[in-house]
Amino acid sequence: MNKNNVLRGLLVLAGLSLSSLALAHGDVTPQAVDTKGLEPLGKEWRDTNPYRKPYAKHDLAVEIGASAYNQNCARCHGLEAKSGGIAPDLRLLETGAEGDEWFKERVINGAVRDGAVYMPKMADFISQEGLWAIRSYLESVHVDE
């Protein structure tokens, strides 16, 4: 009987540990993005990613974008942009202007279906600079299907 109680206790502990890992991807509340060092873009949205190569500070944009992605996007879209099936795998997003168009539309308008919010309007919380830095990061981890 004592062994059964110990086993049950270990199973509960293991379950709690695993559930905390599931929540460790990111915070639900959007986090500020420090874009120091990137060209300020102003209020009007660009149609294409201004931080794409040959932008001189492209590598800095990718670094900022990786951090911002992990803080704001990974909870739903997965660590390193590898989706676990909850939300689209952003590594598969088209590169270049076509992918920029979809990205811009989604971060500005979010995703709502039948009144349920599947993705918040991230542009309400994160600057254009921060979001284009995230886009730069996503292009750096792009994979073909």
Curated annotation (Swiss-Prot):
* Residue ranges annotated for the Cytochrome c domain, each copy included: 60-142
Q: Which PANTHER family match?
A: CYTOCHROME C-553-LIKE, MENAQUINOL-CYTOCHROME C REDUCTASE CYTOCHROME B_C SUBUNIT
Pathway where this protein functions: Alcohol metabolism; ethanol degradation; acetate from ethanol
Residues reported in the UniProt entry to bind heme c:
C73, C76, H77, M119
Q: Quote the protein name from its UniProt record.
A: Cytochrome c550
* Signal peptide (residue range): 1-24
Give the GO molecular function terms: electron transfer activity; heme binding; metal ion binding
Q: Which UniProt keywords apply?
A: Electron transport, Heme, Iron, Metal-binding, Periplasm, Signal, Transport
NCBIfam families, A to Z: c550_PedF
Q: Which InterPro entries match?
A: c550_proteobact, Cyt_c-like_dom, Cyt_c-like_dom_sf, Cytochrome_c550/c551-like
| One GO cellular component term | periplasmic space
Q: Which domain of life is it from?
A: Bacteria
Q: Which Pfam families match?
A: Cytochrome_CBB3
PROSITE patterns xref list: CYTC
Q: What does this protein do?
A: Is an essential component of the ethanol oxidation system that allows P.aeruginosa to grow on ethanol as the sole carbon and energy source. Is the direct electron acceptor of the quinoprotein ethanol dehydrogenase (QEDH).
From the Swiss-Prot or TrEMBL record, state where the protein is found: Periplasm
Query: To which species is this protein native?
Result: Pseudomonas aeruginosa (strain ATCC 15692 / DSM 22644 / CIP 104116 / JCM 14847 / LMG 12228 / 1C / PRS 101 / PAO1)
